[in-house]
């Protein structure tokens, strides 16, 4: 991508207080975005740091607290862009999981599935619905980028409900790409292991360290991807550089899908 691919864009990023969401917000700001609407669910202090990084790049940063599982909150997030008359790119990054060994079928309940689907599948749907008119108002086709997971393809990941929810998100990406063309493009990025505090928080430091070491040792590219590594691909999908790309699920996993099985899933 060329510097300035997001020149004067109005961008919405959900789940942008830390990790991949923050990296996406900072990157679009560095690419010239005019406005970055930063959604977060709980941590206002972390979200403010994301806003600070965007403002340091010259973008206007707007913070909107809200849970994407709540349709009213989704409409409130979209309303923050209303004064600008459009949304050029929507990054549906908010997500959640429940860490559980796949073989431990008694370790997750039906409610766990519903809780994950509410955020990981219904949330992105509600965000697209809330933002549709503003995405269609963009001077070029508006772009939606979903944050899915390599677990959607391999069935691996932090838990069975998580992998299943991301598989559903990939299928929904295809459905929406057909339904919303030609005025809106819809794609998904499917990360593998990302070296962020999210894993350590859910699995513990020791397990996260093993995952990191295993990624470096066993993936074909011998790397543990950072949030910035994944953000580069997500930002590509939201940019004019991918203007002829829709309905794509882009695997950004250092080659994990070629056969490497993460320790957490064994």
Role assignments for model-derived ranges:
Residues 181-185, 190, 245-247:
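Short, small/polar-rich loop/turn modules that mediate ligand/substrate recognition or access, typified
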């Amino acid at each position: 991508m060329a510097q300035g691919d997001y020149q004067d864009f109005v961008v919405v990023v959900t789940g942008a207080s830390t990790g991949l969401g923050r990296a996406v917000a900072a990157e679009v700001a560095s690419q010239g975005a005019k406005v970055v609407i930063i959604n977060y669910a709980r941590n206002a202090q972390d979200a403010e740091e994301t806003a600070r990084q965007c403002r340091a790049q010259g973008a206007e940063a707007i913070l909107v607290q809200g849970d994407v599982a709540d349709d009213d909150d989704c409409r409130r997030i979209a309303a923050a862009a209303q004064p600008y008359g459009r949304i050029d790119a929507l990054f549906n990054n908010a997500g959640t999981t429940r860490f559980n060994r796949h073989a431990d079928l008694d370790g997750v309940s039906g409610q766990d599935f519903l809780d994950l689907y509410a955020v990981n599948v219904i949330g992105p749907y509600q965000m697209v619905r809330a933002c549709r008119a503003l995405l269609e108002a963009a001077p070029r086709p508006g772009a939606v980028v979903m944050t899915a997971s390599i677990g959607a393809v391999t069935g691996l990941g932090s838990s069975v409900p998580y992998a299943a929810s991301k598989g559903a998100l990939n299928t929904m990406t295809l459905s929406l790409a057909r339904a919303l063309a030609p005025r809106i493009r819809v794609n998904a990025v499917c990360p593998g292991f990302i070296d962020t505090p999210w894993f350590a928080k859910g699995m513990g430091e020791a397990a996260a360290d093993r995952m990191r070491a295993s990624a470096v040792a066993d993936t074909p590219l011998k790397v543990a991807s950072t949030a910035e590594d994944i953000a580069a691909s997500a930002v590509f999908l939201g940019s004019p550089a991918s203007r002829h790309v829709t309905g794509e699920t882009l695997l950004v996993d250092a080659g994990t899908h070629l056969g490497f099985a993460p320790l957490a899933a064994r």
